[in-house]
């Protein structure tokens, strides 16, 4: 690995869900320059930190690039995505999701990507108009809502509980309606950091790609390591992580641009988000 480095601290964001384990658990076994500092947090926190200049690069919600594309470049061939069911981004509902018009949906505040996605699915695909509140999906508001959007590890726990009659996998619904995969997160780097530290960005990008490949090869042992965090059986963890994809090929780029066009149509996204701009 290229050990490109200088004395400047490089702040790298990493989503603290087990869906990053094939990359991150491998990363943690490797030696890196001492000035490479990893910050673990939910996607929404990483989004804000990257936007505020508190991170230099890292995995963030796809939504973050869609609304502030002029601030970033995308690192090629890295994502958190799915070609169908993702298994950890669900709309849990007490009634048929197509009947949620005028009902209240409680949204997890952990990922702007999934908040926008569930609104696209309900309002554009299903033609219903619920009301939305943001809050703790395990708090008191959960008992008052007809539906709950949950992501990541908390979605895995809710799914296993069997509490809700309807569990809508948003990756699967998107795929059914668009015939495309869905990209939940990308690896983005701040534009000015790219310009000033291209060699460091190259080295970190190279390391992420290496970890991605190694992690897929070591998936069974990684599942034994991370499954207790949920908790879930290692075999279930293996099935779940096998469905998560980490590349960003042509179809995923098309899917990302389609999502961004929906955001633009909704008045949320920037017209500069399409076409994608890579490092």
Where are these regions (language model features)?
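Conserved beta-strand segments of alpha/beta enzyme cores
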Residues: 11, 36-37, 73, 129-131, ...
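A local structural motif
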Residues: 30-39, 125-135, 269-274
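Long, low-complexity C-terminal extensions of enzymes
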Residues: 253, 260-279
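Pocket-lining segment of extracytoplasmic ligand-binding domains
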Residues: 134-222
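Short, glycine-/small- and polar/acidic-enriched structural segments
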Residues: 15-102, 109-114
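Hydrophobic residues within well-ordered alpha-helices
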Residues: 49-51, 142, 263
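Bilobed "Venus flytrap"/periplasmic-binding protein-like clamshell domains
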Residues: 2-29, 87-145, 153, 254-257
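Secondary-structure end/capping motifs
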Residues: 195-262
């Amino acid at each position: 690995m290229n050990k490109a480095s200088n004395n400047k601290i490089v702040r790298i964001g990493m989503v603290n869900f087990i869906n990053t384990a094939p990359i991150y658990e491998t990363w943690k076994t490797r030696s890196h320059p001492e000035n490479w500092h990893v910050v673990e947090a939910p996607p929404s926190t990483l989004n804000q930190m990257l936007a505020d200049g508190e991170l230099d690069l890292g995995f963030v919600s796809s939504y973050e690039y869609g609304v502030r594309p002029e601030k970033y470049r995308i690192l090629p061939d890295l994502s958190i995505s799915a070609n169908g069911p993702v298994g950890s981004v669900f709309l849990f509902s007490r009634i048929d999701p197509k009947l949620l018009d005028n009902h209240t949906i409680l949204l997890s505040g952990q990922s702007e990507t999934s908040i926008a996605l569930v609104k696209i699915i309900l309002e554009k695909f299903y033609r219903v108009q619920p009301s939305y509140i943001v809050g703790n999906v395990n708090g008191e508001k959960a008992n008052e809502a007809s539906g709950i959007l949950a992501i990541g590890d908390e979605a895995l726990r809710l799914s296993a509980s069997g509490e809700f009659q309807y569990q809508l996998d948003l990756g699967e619904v998107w795929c059914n309606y668009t015939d495309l995969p869905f990209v939940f997160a990308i690896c983005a780097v701040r534009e000015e950091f790219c310009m000033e530290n291209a060699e460091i960005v190259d080295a970190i990008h190279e390391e992420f790609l290496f970890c991605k490949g190694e992690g897929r090869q070591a998936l069974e042992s990684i599942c034994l390591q991370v499954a207790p965090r949920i908790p879930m059986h290692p075999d279930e963890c293996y099935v779940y992580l096998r469905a998560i994809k980490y590349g960003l090929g042509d179809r995923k780029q098309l899917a990302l641009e389609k999502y961004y066009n929906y955001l633009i149509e909704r008045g949320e996204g920037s017209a500069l988000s399409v076409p994608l701009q890579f490092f």
